[in-house]
Amino acid sequence: EKTRDLALFNLAIDSKLRACDLTKLRVRDIAHGMQVTPRAIVMQQRTHRPVQFEITDQTRAALEAWIHQAQLRNEDFLFPSRLHRSDHLSTRQYARIVKAWVTSIDLDPAMYGTHTLRRTKASLIYRRTKNLRAVQLLLGHTKLESTVRYLGIEVEDALDMAEHTEV
């Protein structure tokens, strides 16, 4: 379980995928044979558009350990359900897992959830680069305004950037 959770947590951060896309990944989406690839492309369920993401060394190691431990095949769901009613981990069960992680480190589960994991790396990339277009592509948003709202960029932030930009 710890191996799966580490793989799930790391991939959630790296991929920036929505819960509905993350839980439906198959081994073949992120690996060739037993080798996890450094990049992957997934068709988003919500937008029906492809989104590409990198998979860090740390995440690849966690995923390879999980795939090996769970004896997953190429066509298997990466995070299979333990229930017979479903083939893959449900978004609800994923939310419960995230809530348990959050609670285990004494954070308020009302403040953090599955979307926090999606937003984490995107926010860090934006803070470091201020490149909205890059973050838009990484999140698979169709509109730049969606990315602005998503990151919580306020007028104050925009003015601050403008003041610190030399022409």
Question: What label would you give each PLM region?
Answer:
Residues 1-167:
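Conserved catalytic core of the tyrosine transesterase superfamily
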